[in-house]
């Protein structure tokens, strides 16, 4: 069944009409030219990524140049398996926050508190911890009367009782799991007009990981749904890899782009308000790194190729002026994420599917 699905998917991509019109801001989709532009940016900023070519000319796609058929990074470590104990709570569902990838609630409306990211492990059915009454038993085995609440104060000396220490059984630590490595491939899906991720695992440099075992490193809700085992169409032969299906990628990226723009706008408003304030505390607070999408905006802005030039121009024009100077009009029209930075954001959200794989190993963001 997977072979048939892989074949149909490959031919659908190759036969679909090629779009040359940029709709990046309105749909979250990119053209082949924009994919190459974003790939060049990723390779330039993060040298662990490189361009790859098909194993033979017949495997190349016509809408991408030879030598730039896909992006690849090799040897990405994966130190843990994602079993039912992932993130601490056994036998509990993963909490999917705005689960775009699996097709649930993909609109940009509502859910403003989570910025469209995924929290996995033990959140779907939260336990409300309760403290039960602690009763003592006398020497005859009879339960003593309930004591007043204010008397239930633990004795600090009890912490020194070596017999009270609960030791973890031997062999239960996660460090006993062998480290796997993955080669990650980013291709362009011409049918969906978005990037697509393939993963190929290894138990050792010379021992490939059986495809079925790759699913141990995929979040449970995505196995065999969003993530399937398919042949990599750029190589001769039948090399199966785990692949994240791109059907929801455009809507996810569109939502993240919109929210990043909103976060940048909010950031600028804060700068304006702080510029009018003489409070050093507010200025110091603004200088601290942000979290969520505002933090992502700061990270992306820090990757801008033109930052050094802008900083140089700012130093010349500032002449000792206030560092909290209000942004110029042309800067206010600037978007939070450019099209050449597309793959940086793409890898940030796709990492939620495989949280055990250290994607940050390939990126310094």
Swiss-Prot record:
Residues 125-144 have a biased composition (Basic and acidic residues). It is found in: Cytoplasm. InterPro entries: Atg3/Atg10. One of its GO terms (molecular function) is Atg8-family ligase activity. Residues 103-160, 272-291 are annotated as: Disordered. Residues 251-341 are annotated as: Handle region. Keywords: Autophagy, Cytoplasm, Protein transport, Transport, Ubl conjugation pathway. One of its GO terms (cellular component) is cytosol. GO terms for biological process: autophagosome assembly; autophagy of mitochondrion; glycophagy; nucleophagy; piecemeal microautophagy of the nucleus; protein targeting to membrane; protein transport. Residues 145-160 have a biased composition (Acidic residues). The active site is at 247 (glycyl thioester intermediate). Its main location: cytoplasm. Residues 85-176 are annotated as: Flexible region. Belongs to the ATG3 family. E2 conjugating enzyme required for the cytoplasm to vacuole transport (Cvt) and autophagy. Required for selective autophagic degradation of the nucleus (nucleophagy) as well as for mitophagy which contributes to regulate mitochondrial quantity and quality by eliminating the mitochondria to a basal level to fulfill cellular energy requirements and preventing excess ROS production. Responsible for the E2-like covalent binding of phosphatidylethanolamine to the C-terminal Gly of atg8. Monomer. Interacts with atg8 through an intermediate thioester bond through the C-terminal Gly of atg8. Also interacts with the 40 amino acid C-terminal region of the E1-like atg7 enzyme. Also interacts with the atg12-atg5 conjugate. The N-terminal region is involved in phosphatidylethanolamine-binding and is required for atg8-PE conjugation. The flexible region (FR) is required for atg7-binding. This is Autophagy-related protein 3. It comes from Emericella nidulans (strain FGSC A4 / ATCC 38163 / CBS 112.46 / NRRL 194 / M139) (Aspergillus nidulans).
